[in-house]
Amino acid sequence: MTDNTTPAATAETLPYKNPDLPAGERIADLLSRMTLEEKVGQMMQLDARGGDLEDLIVNKHVGSILHTSPEDLSRAAKTVNEKTRLGIPLIIGDDCIHGYSFWPGATIFPSQLGMAVSWDPDKVKAAGRATAEEVSCTGVHWTFSPVLC
């Protein structure tokens, strides 16, 4: 670890933030700057409901959060940009096994296994598309779906 400056101050000079460099070079540079604690944190995905979001991001160095409220999505991004040493973006995940059920006002569908027994692939596809559109509008990158249970 050789760099203790904030991401905003050095974005132009850090190789891992340079989109013109090959991905492998950027990754090697970023990994060389990370502490063991930061590397372990990047492998964790923690539930953001009711917890201290800043603690998860700044102290636990999480790489991913799930079950995040609309308000917390922008707060999480701001925390990463302003309070973390390397500014590694979060991956936002959520369970979307019957629609975007953690988002107030989203469309709720039967479980995927329940929809499968309808033998109507077009309706199942339409439900998946509707869920994908609702989820993508909220900043979620990763859904845990489909499932077989």
Residue spans for each PLM region:
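N-terminal beta-rich core of secreted/periplasmic extracellular enzymes
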Residues: 2-149
